[in-house]
């Protein structure tokens, strides 16, 4: 199993199994985030699922805490989406 590791521009370090990028659940969840017809509440729920699918519970919690530290205790959805975009576009 090959791992993708990296660090976002904001300094969050992560590692995940590269196979996740071709997993059915990953593609399905990502598709709902990109679909303009998907309700915003569903997109947020699916983004949470996608983060946990990629990073697992521990790294997801670490990411949210990382974002909170940079935003006076808040984790703005825009920042979470930005980090998720960087993580999923990373190639080893």
Which sequence ranges carry the predicted segments?
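Short acidic, Pro/Gly- and aromatic-enriched capping/linker segments at domain boundaries
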Residues: 1-12
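Short, isolated positions in well-ordered beta-strands
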Residues: 13-14, 21
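Short, surface-exposed, charged amphipathic helix/loop patches that serve as local interaction elements
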Residues: 20-92
């Amino acid at each position: 199993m090959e791992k993708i590791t990296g660090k976002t521009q904001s300094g969050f370090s992560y590692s995940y199994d590269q196979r996740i990028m071709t997993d059915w659940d990953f593609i399905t969840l990502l598709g709902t985030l990109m679909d303009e017809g998907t309700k915003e509440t569903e997109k947020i729920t699916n983004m949470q699922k996608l983060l946990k699918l990629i990073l697992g519970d521990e790294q997801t919690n670490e990411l949210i805490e990382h974002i909170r530290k940079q935003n006076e205790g808040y984790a703005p959805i825009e920042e979470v989406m930005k980090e998720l975009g960087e993580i999923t576009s990373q190639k080893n």
